[in-house]
Amino acid sequence: MKGEYEAVARAGVDLQIDCPDLGMGRHIQFADLSLDEFRKMARLHIEALNHALANVPPERSRLHVCWGNYEGPHHHDVALGDIIDVLFTARPSGLSVEASNPRHAHEWRLFERVKLPPGKVLIPGVLDSTTNFIEHPDLVAERIGRYANLVGRENVVAGTDCGFGTWVGQAAVDPDIAWAKLASMAEGARRATREFF
């Protein structure tokens, strides 16, 4: 994919690399490994990714860590705190993480003790992409604010937990609801901007 990644960047488009292997891979593909063995595997995957992105400017790319975009228990998900140091070694400057679903919504507190490396931008999911609830703009602003207070307002970009149509024929969120959720995110971001800028 190295050539394709470079072509995308040359065309002036920012590149997002989706990496379910670094999140969901823990409980789907690598469940038999110890945490240390999984971290070693994750480091190997990031090493390969960094090679593929060697000629793509870090600020033109972001890494999305996905724990599986499905409505399920997620009680075997690897904790963000168990892999954050490994994720920070990835070349992309943007790091997109699930931060709204009930299994990962608490992980913003990780950044009370973990510092975002210079040059990195955090893209927390402020919308749960698996439910038809439309988040209130004030909740979106609150979620953005939690991260802005911890990593700096200039280092936060609002995102969604994942995409709204991950698998063909298995749309958990009605398309009209997805658009309404995105409108709520835009309004919540405006409110957070007024508060922090």
Each model region followed by its residue ranges:
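Domain-level signal for soluble alpha/beta catalytic cores
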Residues: M1-F197
